[in-house]
Amino acid sequence: MKGKNKYFTDYDFEEAYQKQIDNLQQAEIERLTKNRKGIAYQTKTTKAGNQLEADIYPAFGNRQDAPRTKRGNKSRPAQKNLNDKRAKRYLNNLISANFGKGDIWATFTYDEEHLPESPEDADRIFANYIRRINRRRRKAGKDNAKYIVVTEWSDDEEKGIRCHHHVIIDGSNDRDELENLWRQGSRNHTRRIDPDPDTHAAGIANYITKDPHGRKRWRASKNLKKPIVTKSYSRFGKRTAERMATDRGYLEERITKAYPGYKFIDAEVKINDINGGFYIYARMRRD
């Protein structure tokens, strides 16, 4: 949208910039950037726990110069169905903002006698499970559980209904207690989270959101902290951003300088083959 700086940024930059610059020869990059459009670069910073993401992408003087994308009925990041990269990234940040070392990652299954009739029935069963947990917690003087649940559902002609829940929940409950309160199946697994310092919860998020054979949907408790998102036109100027896109050492140097107290992890650079603009995505973690 156009704000007080009169830049147009109301477009899907993740969809508009998809060609990996690392896969291109220098001559191809120069050809694509010859007629480059865009008068500034906007930086979107997302802080989630000790993780930080920076999206750096072109802003335009008018709508006509911005790349066209298929807007249609785009799914929102907070959707129940995990059907696109945006939803998975949102979920990863939500996990990073709320969970860490000592919290619990669990998988709960159903035996044949307790299979839900539908995904909605599975949601109801899991909601009842959380109510049982929270009753125990209130008696112990604890707050309600913080959790994220991803439900995987399939209904195959040969195998029939298959359903299970991947859950990340705060570590206030004992693992045995959590398993005992689940009454729909016995093939369950719980473990304490011990995240990698660089990727934090990304490994868990990637696993529980991997492309399923059936459907995946997710829900979260209402007491979670939201990732902190800010936007700026002044963090990286146009010339700086364009040099960062083609000089990996300079990219790491400028990103590290822009976010003191954070360690650079990795970055990827993409280019739009119509307007020659760059999109930089960088990840960092707090030292």
Q: Where are the language model's segments positioned?
A:
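Conserved, short, structured surface segments that act as functional micro-motifs
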Residues: H164
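Right-hand nucleic-acid polymerase module
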Residues: M1-I161, G171-D287
